[in-house]
Amino acid sequence: MTSSNLIKQLQERGLVAQVTDEDALAERLAQGPISLYCGFDPTADSLHLGHLVPLLCLKRFQLAGHRPVALVGGATGMIGDPSFKASERKLNTEDTVNEWVEKIRRQVSPFLDFDCGDNSAIAANNYDWFGGMNVLTFLRDIGKHFSVNQMINKEAVKQRLNRDDSGISFTEFSYNLLQAYDFACLNKAHGVALQIGGSDQWGNITSGIDLTRRLHQQQVYGLTVPLITKADGTKFGKTEGGAVWLDPKKTSPYKFYQFWINTADADVYRFLKFFTFMNLEEINALEEEDKNSGKAPRAQYVLAENVTGMVHGEEGLAAAKRITASLFSGDLNDMTEADFAQLAQDGMPTIELTRDADLQQALVNAELVPSRGQARTMISSNAVAINGEKQSDPEYAFTDADRLFGRYTLLRRGKKHYCLISWL
């Protein structure tokens, strides 16, 4: 992306929900590089897919020559943002928050370039300026610039105040002031002139703009990216198992890859604009190719490869593709021991068996059949596979050759019902 018309390019990709003083911001960007920031609160030990669009937006600005600041909220994470939350967040201990801060800092780092000259990225933590601030300083230097009347009229706060079952605590009510002061601090320390965030952050961002103007007499700007929804109206970034995380220990590269493979045709080309750096001409050409090919669309695989490779690297992408191909073909020869561990992590039904168990018992224990009698019937009808190979002998006893890496056997009943055996 070029800097001269960056806002327009972001809009063409559907990446702008709201922007303050668009003409003035476009003019400022055309004059030369700026510093901008996006904040990530450590409310869990990993970022999830909802964080990916603003994080990639930081990267888009850096590629256009601007300097990104990734702010991890060591202070704000101890309170929790009430914006559009139905109830108050659980408060985590300082040790927990500090641990999560470090994990998220490491997670953000690969997306940005911290050693590229004048626009090298900066990592910041708002605990650095809030940790030593006392309550009198906070009230005198920050609180006096805020009108309670305006604060309670912000949509995110109004929604909580209007709920019969829960109001809002003073702790969460004060969050808006803390995030606003982040903007003012980063403006003073690094010349930050733009904050980006999800559209639920609009009220916090505009508060920061007002406070920066009052404290430093500087004109600064805000830009929000849309909260992503799917064409069918359901939430993006959720599966039956919960959120899709960027941490491979919480969502494996294989499961992450499968999430994108399962993207609906109605969403996939839009998601290519949001989550990849393919130019619009490439995306439009791919859409046209898929429409005219008469085959299953390629777009989901392009999306899955792009995003999985970006988040999990070449090794993670290779593992995801290897597992996908192996399960589809039934040929498990290319799978590694770590690949089988990924399947267990991802929630594939897994059982432990002693080495004297036969195939009938394994099917019953795996809950692939209700009884040994039913197991005999399924095996005899050629409906059971061991490591991808059909087995029709109802009296079959496992051999060492069935125990891949000495410990794993993959059972399949029919085409879709799997269970992984971990041998004791």
Swiss-Prot record:
Tell me, what is an example of a GO biological process annotation in this record? tyrosyl-tRNA aminoacylation
Q: What is its main location?
A: cytoplasm
Q: Which organism is it from?
A: Yersinia enterocolitica serotype O:8 / biotype 1B (strain NCTC 13174 / 8081)
Entry annotated with the keyword Ligase:
yes
A GO MF term? RNA binding
Which InterPro entries does the UniProt entry name for this protein? Answer: aa-tRNA-synth_I_CS, aa-tRNA-synth_Ic, Rossmann-like_a/b/a_fold, S4_RNA-bd, S4_RNA-bd_sf, SYY-like_C, Tyr-tRNA-ligase, Tyr-tRNA-ligase_bac-type
Matching Pfam families, A to Z? SYY_C-terminal (PF22421), tRNA-synt_1b (PF00579)
- What CDD domains does the annotation carry? S4 (cd00165), TyrRS_core (cd00805)
The protein depicted here goes by the name Tyrosine--tRNA ligase
Q: How does it assemble?
A: Homodimer.
Q: Which Gene3D superfamilies match?
A: HUPs, RNA-binding S4 domain, Tyrosyl-Transfer RNA Synthetase
Locate the motif 'HIGH' region: 42-51
Organism lineage string = Bacteria, Pseudomonadati, Pseudomonadota, Gammaproteobacteria, Enterobacterales
Q: Work out whether the entry's keyword set contains ATP-binding.
A: yes
Task: List cellular component terms (GO).
Answer: cytosol
Q: What is this enzyme's catalytic activity, as reactions?
A: tRNA(Tyr) + L-tyrosine + ATP = L-tyrosyl-tRNA(Tyr) + AMP + diphosphate + H(+)
